[in-house]
């Protein structure tokens, strides 16, 4: 039997579990980006030097290498290229190239939601500042300004007054790949912002790992999650509504099989909104912790899907307690010395520790998910215990800077 080849776009730590799952299945792994020193390349079988946002260059490399599957797992910039290559080569992917382009462009996604009767904030996309400044009366202030093509809350600003719009647009454009940005009404949430790692099989939404997002109000970017907690305490009626709307979205887009990262919220107006839906795993190791927290290995399922292997026994997660990802970060710049974790807390609640920065490395403030220093996986018996820990996390976990 000829060994299957899987191309993974990117080289970050998020790919390591997929490389491990692929190797368990006897799959040959090729990692691809333009940064040969990235950590994932040390664990793959082959490295391909190519820009993952250049879809035609990725296609050319994939055809030359004779791949059987492609993923941009938890790597947002490569999703469109992965969908493009999969469609051109007849490989498995969550959706068509056109559907991926809609989902990956915040402006196009908002328009698609609006055209198809989904709850959607008042929103408009732009490619130049002047057009946006002419539309200040179109919006119900405050507004959110963000790039149409970035993830991890990079380039996102809440703007309360029109006079501050130019600076917010400049920041959004500084984090954009394609030079486009979107402005939309700020939706005041009720309870937590919620996300989900959701898995679809043959067009049917079968798995939803809903989690609640926590934010550090002292961070430079207060819209970047500082923790995620499972299972979500969103009211069941809203979870059911979100699942129903996701299924409707996936049917309209002709989705097939694979993993999606979803962000949603219930607002003070009583409506539930789909905020982001991307055909990839979420960052911050979301799919990884679900393998601790619940009874379905979605990383294995996504790996199997990528090369056309069957997926069995996909179902809603049954949780084994209450779990959290704590995103280690600094509120100021400095030189990294280490992370101090209180010993009893570590013994009782920390199930995995991951540090991405070496001692002596430069540390920046928490401007986005890419500024994370690492993660802690936490477990408690109940939600009240988890909430009390997160409310005073600095008592247990300290970032030491010089």
Summary of predicted features, one role per range:
Residues 163, 185-255, 259, 266, ...:
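ATP-dependent carboxylate/phosphate-activation module, predominantly the ATP-grasp catalytic core
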Residues 119-122, 142-145, 157-190, 220-228, ...:
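Conserved ATP-binding module of the ATP-grasp superfamily
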Residues 1-99, 130, 309-312, 321, ...:
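ATP-binding N-terminal substructure of ATP-dependent carboxylate-amine bond-forming enzymes
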Residues 113, 139-159, 177-190, 196, ...:
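ATP-grasp fold ATP-binding core
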Residues 5-7, 143, 205:
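Conserved hydrophobic helix-helix packing surfaces used for dimerization/oligomerization
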Residues 260, 345-361:
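A structural supersecondary motif
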Residues 310-348:
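A glycine-rich beta-turn/hairpin centered on an aromatic-Pro dipeptide
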Residues 87-155:
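A conserved helix-loop-beta module that forms one wall/lid of the active-site cleft
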């Amino acid at each position: 039997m000829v060994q299957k080849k899987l191309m993974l776009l990117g080289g970050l730590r998020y790919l390591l579990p997929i490389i491990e799952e692929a190797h368990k299945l006897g799959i040959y792994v090729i990692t691809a980006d333009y940064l040969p020193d990235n950590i994932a390349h040390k664990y793959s079988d082959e490295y391909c030097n190519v820009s993952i946002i250049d879809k035609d260059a990725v296609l050319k490399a994939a055809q030359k290498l004779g791949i059987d599957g492609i993923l941009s797992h938890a790597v947002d910039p490569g999703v469109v290229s992965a969908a493009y290559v999969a469609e051109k080569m007849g490989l498995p992917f969550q959706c068509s190239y056109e559907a991926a382009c809609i989902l990956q462009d915040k402006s196009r996604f908002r328009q698609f939601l609006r055209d198809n009767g989904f709850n959607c904030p008042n929103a408009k996309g732009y490619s130049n500042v002047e057009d946006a400044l002419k539309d200040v009366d179109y919006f119900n202030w405050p507004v959110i300004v963000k790039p149409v093509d970035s993830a991890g809350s990079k380039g996102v600003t809440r703007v309360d007054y029109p006079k501050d719009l130019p600076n917010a647009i400049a920041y959004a454009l500084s984090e954009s790949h394609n030079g486009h940005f979107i402005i939309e009404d700020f939706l005041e949430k009720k309870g937590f912002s919620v996300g989900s790692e959701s898995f679809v099989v043959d067009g049917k939404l079968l798995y939803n790992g809903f989690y609640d997002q926590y934010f550090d109000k002292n961070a430079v970017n207060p819209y970047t999650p500082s923790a995620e907690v499972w299972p979500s305490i969103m009211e069941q009626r809203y979870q059911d509504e979100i699942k129903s709307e996701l299924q409707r979205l996936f049917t309209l887009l002709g989705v097939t099989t694979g993993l999606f990262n979803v962000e949603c919220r219930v607002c003070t107006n009583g409506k539930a909104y789909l905020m982001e839906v991307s055909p990839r795993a979420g960052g911050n190791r979301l799919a990884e912790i679900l393998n601790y927290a619940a009874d379905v290995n979605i990383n294995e399922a996504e790996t199997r899907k990528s090369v056309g292997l069957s997926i069995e026994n996909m179902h809603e997660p049954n949780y084994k307690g209450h779990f959290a990802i704590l995103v280690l970060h600094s509120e100021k710049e400095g030189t990294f010395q280490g992370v101090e974790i209180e010993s009893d807390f570590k013994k009782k609640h920390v199930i995995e520790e991951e540090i991405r920065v070496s001692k002596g490395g430069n540390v920046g403030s928490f401007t986005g998910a890419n500024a994370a220093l690492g993660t802690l996986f936490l477990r408690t018996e109940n939600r009240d215990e988890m909430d009390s820990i997160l409310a005073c996390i600095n008592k247990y976990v300290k970032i030491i800077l010089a």
